[in-house]
C-alpha cells in the first residue's frame, strides 16, 4: 500500500515539474518587446539590444528591445 502511494506521489511530482517547465518556455519575450537588461529572456534567436536616446543633445534614457541576433539598427540619414 505504501509503495502504491509513494509511486503515485512521485508520478504526480514528475508531471507537475514537466508542466511548470513547459509554462516557463512560453514566457520568453517576442520580437519587438521591451526588455530591461542584456539577458532579459528574449525568445530564442533574439537578443536584447539597448541604445541611449538623446533629444537636443540631452540624454533621455536607455531603451532595450528584443531583436533578431546579429541585426543592427542605425540612425537614418536625413
Curated annotation (Swiss-Prot):
It comes from the Eukaryota. It is found in: Secreted. GO terms for molecular function: toxin activity. Residues 1-22 form the signal peptide. Residues 23-26 form a propeptide. GO terms for cellular component: extracellular region. Contains 4 disulfide bonds. Expressed by the venom gland. Keywords: Disulfide bond, Secreted, Signal, Toxin. InterPro entries: Spider_toxin_CSTX_knottin. Belongs to the neurotoxin 19 (CSTX) family. 07 (U7-Lctx) subfamily. This is U7-lycotoxin-Ls1h. It comes from Lycosa singoriensis (Wolf spider).
